[in-house]
Amino acid sequence: MTDKIRTLQGRVVSDKMEKSIVVAIERFVKHPIYGKFIKRTTKMHVHDENNECGIGDVVEIRECRPLSKTKSWTLVRVVEKAVL
């Protein structure tokens, strides 16, 4: 059994909540019949303790214990700030 902590990178799409952000994770999936790669997006609710993220920021997140009904990820660092 491995205890590797899952980390992902994505873009912030919402920061309207207090101490929470919504991060969109993009991945490419191959179509089973046609073989074309399709872009799929997963939205995750992430805990942002210091409210340091804004919309458009690229962030790194890691999995943690469930913090609420929908939040099981926490912010590690801001990789790139959005250009306003």
UniProtKB/Swiss-Prot annotation:
Is RNA-binding a UniProt keyword of this protein? yes
Bilayer-crossing residues are none
Q: Identify the keywords attached in UniProt to this record, alphabetized.
A: Ribonucleoprotein, Ribosomal protein, RNA-binding, rRNA-binding
Output the Gene Ontology cellular-component terms: cytosolic small ribosomal subunit
Q: What Pfam families does its record include?
A: Ribosomal_S17
Q: Which PROSITE patterns match?
A: RIBOSOMAL_S17
**Biological process according to GO:** translation
Mind telling me which InterPro entries this protein's record contains? NA-bd_OB-fold, Ribosomal_uS17, Ribosomal_uS17_bact/chlr, Ribosomal_uS17_CS
Molecular function GO terms recorded:
rRNA binding; structural constituent of ribosome
Tell me which domain of life the UniProt entry assigns to the organism this sequence originates from: Bacteria
Q: How does it assemble?
A: Part of the 30S ribosomal subunit.
Q: Which family does it belong to?
A: Belongs to the universal ribosomal protein uS17 family.
Q: PANTHER family from the entry?
A: 40S RIBOSOMAL PROTEIN S11 FAMILY MEMBER (PTHR10744), SMALL RIBOSOMAL SUBUNIT PROTEIN US17M (PTHR10744:SF1)
The protein's job, in short, is: One of the primary rRNA binding proteins, it binds specifically to the 5'-end of 16S ribosomal RNA.
**Protein name as it appears in the record:** Small ribosomal subunit protein uS17
At the highest ranks, the source species' classification is:
Bacteria, Pseudomonadati, Pseudomonadota, Gammaproteobacteria, Enterobacterales
